[in-house]
């Protein structure tokens, strides 16, 4: 076990490179199971969840080769198992993404019910119901989803909830199904589009990704390709908020500003000077930010994965801001930890009312999930004294070398053993 120690007070200044998006890398790695030939995935972030996914594929017998620059070549010719065991799936909800590809290409799958962040109800019934509609025989027992199918059939599926992993799983399954599948109320996130681009490069026929209706014409086989993962929009937003909170000036490279327009808008509203080009964005903040109101929503709305970071920004801003969470329940646990640092936050159901204070005071805090841990690091960057963030295995699931990148920008931060 490790922790982060942060001495606040240093404005962040300089340039850093943004990593590939975890939430794009994981479904694309699952999609490699669909291809007959080897697939190479580029711009893979070096993260715990990616390592877990590679271990999961390796347990199935898939051959993986890691090249320079975190390019991963995946060859499924040696696959001999179609089981995703509990000891791997329990740490990462995205493991369920292998369910659709395994059923579609190999006709069988046994996937443990998933784990991951403790941020409310994320039921798997949408995955199961959709695959059943495509003809799969599925039972859930002994903690596993067990499925069989001769060949999946195209179906018209309306998802009760717009879910990213549900959309991705069913889209991958439909890619090799017989006939046409229509997904209604589909997630519109950029990571869904990135996955559709990968499937189409393999020879698939996916249309409408990025809209609420996706149509997939199934094909008999898919081929291996070289696919590059898109930049991490949440990492981009996190470092921009960090710079705004510390009164700094940063330039982020190898990113995609068009994917974070809602975040950039709120940062400008807070008083930051923001500029962007094709693959870069800069931010400069003079003095304290102004508090902002925001409400999370599925893409292209304000991302729930940036909510905690803006709670931290509001905590040291001038004025009062209200943050409303509409995507997940139970996602204000970071606010309780920030209160221990002196933040003035009132939780009212799905709403956090935050009155900015002039300073936060360092304290030992505990990370409860991935984005909560990031917000506590941001709070530590501006707190007086030394902040200790425990349980940072959460942050390692979604941020590549966070202490190294922050230190590169001038933060006083170090990783130490417990």
Swiss-Prot record:
It comes from Halorhodospira halophila (strain DSM 244 / SL1). The lineage of its organism: Bacteria, Pseudomonadati, Pseudomonadota, Gammaproteobacteria, Chromatiales. Gene3D superfamilies: Enolpyruvate transferase domain (3.65.10.10). It is found in: Cytoplasm. It is an enzyme of class 2 (transferase). Pathway: Cell wall biogenesis; peptidoglycan biosynthesis. This is UDP-N-acetylglucosamine 1-carboxyvinyltransferase. GO terms for molecular function: UDP-N-acetylglucosamine 1-carboxyvinyltransferase activity. Cell wall formation. Adds enolpyruvyl to UDP-N-acetylglucosamine. UDP-N-acetyl-alpha-D-glucosamine binds at residues 93, 305, 327.
């Amino acid at each position: 076990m490790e922790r982060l120690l942060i001495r606040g007070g240093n404005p962040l200044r300089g340039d850093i490179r943004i990593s590939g998006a975890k939430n794009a890398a994981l479904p694309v790695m699952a999609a490699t199971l669909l291809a007959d030939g080897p697939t190479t995935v580029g711009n893979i972030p070096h993260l715990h969840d990616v390592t877990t996914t590679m271990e999961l594929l390796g347990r199935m017998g898939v051959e993986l080769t890691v090249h320079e620059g975190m390019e991963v070549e995946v060859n499924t010719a040696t696959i001999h198992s179609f089981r995703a065991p509990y000891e791997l799936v329990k740490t990462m909800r995205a493991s369920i993404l292998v369910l659709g590809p395994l059923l579609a290409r190999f006709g069988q799958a046994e996937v443990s019910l998933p784990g991951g962040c403790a941020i409310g109800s994320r039921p798997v019934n949408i995955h199961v119901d959709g695959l059943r509609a495509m003809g799969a025989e599925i039972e859930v027992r002994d903690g596993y989803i067990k499925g069989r199918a001769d060949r999946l059939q195209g179906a018209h599926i309306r998802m009760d909830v717009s879910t990213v992993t549900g959309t991705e799983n069913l889209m991958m399954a439909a890619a090799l199904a017989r006939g046409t599948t229509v997904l209604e109320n589909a997630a519109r996130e950029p990571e869904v589009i990135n996955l559709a681009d990968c499937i189409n490069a393999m020879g698939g026929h996916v249309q409408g990704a990025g809209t609420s209706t996706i149509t997939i014409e199934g094909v008999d086989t898919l081929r291996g390709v070289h696919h590059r993962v898109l930049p991490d929009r949440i990492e981009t937003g996190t470092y921009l908020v960090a710079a705004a909170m510390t009164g700094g000036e940063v330039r982020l490279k190898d990113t995609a500003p068009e994917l974070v327009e809602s975040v950039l808008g709120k940062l400008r509203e807070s008083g930051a000077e923001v500029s962007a080009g094709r693959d870069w964005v800069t931010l400069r903040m003079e003095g304290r930010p102004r508090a902002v109101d925001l409400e999370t929503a599925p893409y292209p709305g304000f991302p729930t994965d940036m909510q905690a970071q803006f709670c931290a920004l509001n905590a040291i801003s001038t004025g009062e801001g209200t943050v409303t969470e509409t995507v997940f329940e139970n996602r204000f646990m970071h606010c309780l930890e920030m209160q221990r640092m002196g933040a003035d936050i009132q939780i009212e159901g799905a709403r956090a009312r935050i009155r900015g204070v002039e300073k936060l005071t360092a304290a030992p805090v505990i990370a409860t999930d991935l984005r909560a841990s990031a917000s506590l690091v941001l709070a530590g960057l501006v707190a007086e004294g030394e902040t200790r963030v425990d349980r940072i295995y959460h942050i390692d699931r979604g941020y590549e070398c966070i202490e190294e990148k922050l230190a590169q920008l001038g933060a006083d931060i170090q990783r130490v053993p417990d």
